[in-house]
Amino acid sequence: HVSKRAQATLFVHPNDHPYDSDLVQMNREGRVVAVHGKPHAEGIDYPNCVNAAFYLMENRLIGQIPVGISSDFGRDLFPRWASEHRLFAYASPEYIKDMGKPERHAEVERAVTTGKVSARNLTQPQRAIFLDRDGVINLDTDLIKHPDEMQVYAFAGKAIRQINQSDFISVVVTNQSAVARGLTDLDGIDAIHARMDRQLGAQGAFVDALYYCPHHPHGGFPEERPEYKIPCNCRKPSPGMLLAAADRFNIDLSQSWMVGDSPRDIEAGRAAGVRTIRVRTGHGAVPGPEPDFWADTLEDAVARIFTEETPTT
């Protein structure tokens, strides 16, 4: 809040019902550029970035609230203020939940008494399941460059929903060299991920965070973008994306997992120090280093993780 010189900072997170939630759209610097109040028009893709109704605001902005007029932050004020004031978003998997209804109050009460709320505080080490995207969550049609090419597997929503309901956070780490090849740009990648969010949200699932590498080390493509044709530490099999997430979310890598379909996913997981599962979807038949475990699909991989994490007597 202070470093951004924000007039207001909104706590945002994904949830399992984005279709009936107020959604916050921000730029790559975290500045809020739009707030889309519910209900949403059919067929519109928005990132699953939900207004959690928890704000830090400067007094001078509070003074902009109309006196004597009923105003809702999500519906009336933030959509207008996004273009007039410095609004920023703080995105986090930490536990924040509206408990204005009896059933939600009971759910929050259980989360407090079981220790889930305190465990999700980022001062505590987190466990993560890192997920490759193409061939794991969605059909790999080779260098997806348009939202219409995003087809989430039928089993992916159930699998990721099980992660959402567990003590793990879900983090997508994906190579997207279509940017370096000039087939799309960063806005195009964001649009593709918004489509993925909408498809997962329709299945009651979400990813807590997403990292992608737009680079590619080799030149020679007709429409390539030279600024992205560079060696980097983020492109798998390098572990840069996993390490960046670990730093941001205080992830204990020794207690975390990587699920991928390609050899580079397994190599990245090994380099980061997480346990690895390779699925047989996507590029699962390509020869490569042996993972810790094999699974047919993401759903099977998640089931295997939970089996391995369950203490035996």
Regions found by a protein language model. Name each.
Residues 225-227, 233-263:
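Conserved Lys-Pro-Asp/Glu-containing loop-to-beta segment of HAD-superfamily phosphomonoesterases
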Residues 156, 160-196, 203-222, 269:
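Substrate-recognition element of Asp-dependent hydrolases with the DxDx(T/V) motif
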Residues 2, 15-18, 28-118:
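Catalytic-core segments of class I nucleotidyltransferases/pyrophosphorylases
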Residues 138-154, 179-188, 202-203, 225-234:
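Metal-dependent phosphoesterase signature
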Residues 126-171:
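Active-site neighborhood of HAD-like aspartate-dependent phosphohydrolases
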Residues 4-14:
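A short, conserved acidic/glycine-rich loop-to-beta-strand motif
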Residues 1, 24, 30, 58, ...:
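Residue-level signal for inorganic ion chemistry
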Residues 257-296:
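Acidic, Mg2+-coordinating phosphoryl-transfer loop and its flanking beta/alpha structural elements
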